[in-house]
């Protein structure tokens, strides 16, 4: 009875909140599922059946698979024989399960060899289980994906490939390609240890694998053949104007539903943790956009393509050379790919659709600095931010009103925005495509300081992105996108810090009060002059909580009960000593903004603020 109640609860019609982290299975089922993950041969069996249908049924076969796919299928066929005479488990199934266990539990090579030896001694005579990891890897060789280690200049000037493949020193800065040791008498010797290595995993073979089974092949044409239950809603990138615009410009490419559009995503991270010395890796991921919405952003459909061993900066174009070369080849010449569903080979074309990242990476990818006087990369210098004299920085305050409809009441509001200012100007024009390329081509290089002449005064270009090498880049309406979760986290963090009046995190500081007194008509927020030897006083704003109210809010957070995995950090991170919540992540801020903010401040702030 106890197990039944734990599993099913007291109410028979209780709705389980599985999308909020609540489990819908008992622990026994979860454990059994983990075990079954290493005992499921359905996927391998389906691939073998697909191969036999394609290779032996002459009535259905139209073409032989192309070379890579053929080697892949032949490996599967050779590995289909049973492990021994008394089982249906194939050699490939057994190796795949054992390799999965090795990966999950981080077994060493020696430990894996011993495990194979022990298992082999328990099997009947004549079994074909490999005796070592070397033999297992040899059998699985056709399953492996290619990867490259490319030596790079320590300063990021060049990659030692193509015409520089044999060079030992950088042709631009003369830095050594390899580690040097002092041999005395001012002599140095190069060791066979590269100073910097770029790791590249070609993405095209990984995309080709998606066409080798019928199920994934159908998913790769969903963008064109998939059913939309509500055509008025945007449920997929193919429903957007940018996708349709590209189809209209290149109808021949768009006609073939199997052609693939990809997105690039990147972000920097410290592999050694936040407490370690500052060091940044920049992985670049490739995402096929043809897939249905439900599987588009699943982990196995996001391909790691580049691992850049430093902050991107202005060297992004150098490190992305291999990726751009593959994109150029896939666009201009195409790649022969085997289609499992039609048993034919077709020439697959792949092209870049857009990138996805946070705002700083947006500036790196686009080549336009997102800080300073012209931080808006779409309108560029047409939208000039204002300078805050006390804050010592540029601000976008009140620049949003020009984007509103001409009859919007906010345009005529002279009280709640910049005082005594009515906005009649239209929205600045968006610069895209050929106009941006023409502006880039007209820039003059600053030979003395580097960069381009006029930077910071006339424009904010820091570099010409390597993406402009793509012949179709001019025709992309939205070549770059900002990650919503990053943006939401930054905005929510600022709101939370301001409401809770957290030092160094609140936007309602003394400098902001002085600047708003100059710009706005809000006398209740102006700094109060000193009296009788006292210092300047900052009046409390209606949207800021008192210390007692902040304590009540944090104690309320500690009492909140959430489903497992939903927002546990909000409770665990409360620190009453500092009146803060620590270790919050993007998802936690999302929950706070969407669910908790209205409840948290109601009753503490005036009705017009709430």
Annotate each PLM feature.
Residues 1-610:
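A structural signal for the principal folded core domain
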């Amino acid at each position: 009875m106890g197990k039944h109640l734990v599993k099913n609860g007291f109410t028979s019609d209780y709705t389980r909140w599985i999308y909020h982290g609540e489990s819908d299975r008992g622990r026994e089922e979860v454990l059994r599922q983990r075990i079954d993950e290493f005992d499921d041969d359905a996927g391998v069996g389906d691939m073998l059946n697909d191969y036999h249908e394609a290779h032996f049924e002459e009535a259905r076969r139209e073409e032989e698979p192309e070379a890579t796919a053929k080697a892949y299928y032949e490996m599967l066929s050779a590995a289909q024989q049973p492990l021994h005479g008394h089982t249906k488990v194939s050699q490939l199934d057994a190796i795949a399960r054992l390799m999965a266990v090795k990966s999950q539990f981080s077994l060493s090579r020696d430990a894996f060899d011993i495990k194979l030896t022990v298992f082999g001694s328990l099997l009947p005579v004549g079994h074909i289980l490999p005796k070592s990891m070397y033999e297992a890897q040899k059998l699985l060789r056709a399953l492996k994906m290619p990867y490259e280690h490319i030596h790079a200049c320590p300063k990021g000037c060049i990659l030692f490939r193509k015409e520089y493949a044999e060079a030992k020193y950088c042709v631009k800065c003369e830095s050594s390609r390899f580690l040097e040791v002092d041999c005395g008498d001012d002599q140095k010797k190069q060791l066979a240890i590269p100073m910097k290595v770029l790791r590249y995993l070609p993405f095209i073979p990984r995309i080709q694998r998606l066409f080798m089974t019928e199920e994934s092949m159908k998913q790769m044409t969903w963008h064109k053949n998939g059913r939309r239950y509500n055509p008025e809603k945007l449920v997929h990138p193919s429903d957007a104007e940018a996708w349709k615009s590209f189809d209209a410009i290149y109808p021949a490419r768009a006609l073939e539903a199997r052609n693939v559009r990809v997105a690039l995503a990147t972000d920097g991270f410290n592999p050694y943790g936040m407490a370690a010395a500052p060091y940044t890796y920049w992985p670049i991921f490739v995402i096929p956009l043809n897939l249905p919405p439900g599987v588009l952003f699943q982990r196995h459909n996001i391909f790691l393509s580049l691992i850049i061993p430093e902050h991107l900066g202005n060297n992004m174009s150098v490190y992305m050379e291999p990726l751009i070369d593959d994109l150029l080849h896939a666009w201009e010449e195409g790649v022969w790919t085997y289609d499992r569903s039609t048993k034919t080979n077709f020439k697959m074309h792949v092209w870049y659709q857009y990138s996805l990242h946070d705002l700083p990476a947006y500036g790196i990818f686009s080549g336009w600095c997102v800080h300073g006087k012209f931080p808006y990369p779409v309108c560029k210098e047409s939208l000039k931010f204002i300078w805050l004299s006390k804050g010592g920085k540029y601000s976008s305050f009140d620049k949003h009103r020009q984007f509103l409809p001409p009859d919007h009441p906010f345009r005529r509001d002279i009280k709640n925005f910049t005082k005594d200012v009515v906005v009649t100007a239209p929205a600045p024009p968006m610069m895209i495509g050929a106009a941006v390329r023409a502006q880039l081509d007209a820039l003059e290089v600053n030979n003395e300081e580097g960069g381009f002449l006029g930077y910071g005064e006339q424009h904010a270009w820091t570099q010409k992105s390597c993406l402009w090498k793509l012949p179709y880049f001019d025709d992309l309406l939205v070549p770059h996108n900002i990650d919503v979760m990053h943006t939401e986290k930054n905005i929510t963090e600022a709101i939370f810090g301001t409401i809770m009046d957290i030092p160094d995190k609140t936007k309602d500081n003394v400098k902001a009060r002085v600047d708003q007194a100059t710009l706005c008509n809000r006398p209740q927020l102006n700094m109060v002059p000193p009296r009788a030897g006292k210092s300047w006083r900052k009046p409390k704003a209606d949207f800021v909580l008192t210390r007692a109210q902040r304590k009540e809010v944090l104690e309320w957070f500690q009492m909140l009960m959430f489903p497992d995995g939903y927002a546990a950090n909000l409770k665990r991170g409360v620190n009453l000593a500092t009146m803060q919540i620590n270790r919050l992540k993007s998802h936690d801020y999302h929950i706070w903004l969407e669910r908790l903010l209205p409840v948290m401040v109601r009753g503490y702030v005036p009705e017009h603020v709430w």
